[in-house]
Amino acid sequence: MESAQAVAEPLDLVRLSLDEIVYVKLRGDRELNGRLHAYDEHLNMVLGDAEEIVTIFDDEETDKDKALKTIRKHYEMLFVRGDSVILIAPPRN
């Protein structure tokens, strides 16, 4: 990734992330990790080799540790609608 001096506008940071692995937080307790192939000004984007992580809260479960469940799905290529995007960042460890 290039230096922070190349970032003059918010979408410049996204541009610098092209062909890099990114973390995308979505509405509805969804998260994505994948390679950013394309995006537009609405933050519609195409991710390759993407993993979706969905967090579900089971309110009928009495044990709070077991109430939170995650479901993971893998996609070779995925289109993400921009109005569902909350944030884009480098991948979390």
From Swiss-Prot:
InterPro entries, alphabetized: Lsm3, LSM_dom_sf, Sm, Sm-like_LSM3, Sm_dom_euk/arc
Principal subcellular localisation of the protein: nucleus
Cellular component terms per the entry's GO annotation: catalytic step 2 spliceosome; chromosome, telomeric repeat region; Lsm1-7-Pat1 complex; Lsm2-8 complex; nucleolus; nucleus; P-body; precatalytic spliceosome
Subcellular localization: Nucleus; Cytoplasm
GO biological process terms on file: mRNA splicing, via spliceosome; P-body assembly; RNA folding
Domain Sm as annotated: residue spans: 9-93
Phosphoprotein as UniProt keyword: yes
Residues with PTM Phosphoserine: S84
Keyword Ribonucleoprotein assigned: yes
Similarity annotation: Belongs to the snRNP Sm proteins family.
Subunit structure comment from the entry: Component of the heptameric LSM1-LSM7 complex that forms a seven-membered ring structure with a donut shape. The LSm subunits are arranged in the order lsm1, lsm2, lsm3, lsm6, lsm5, lsm7 and lsm4. Component of the heptameric LSM2-LSM8 complex that forms a seven-membered ring structure with a donut shape. The LSm subunits are arranged in the order lsm8, lsm2, lsm3, lsm6, lsm5, lsm7 and lsm4.
Listed name of the protein: LSM complex subunit lsm3
Gene name as annotated: lsm3
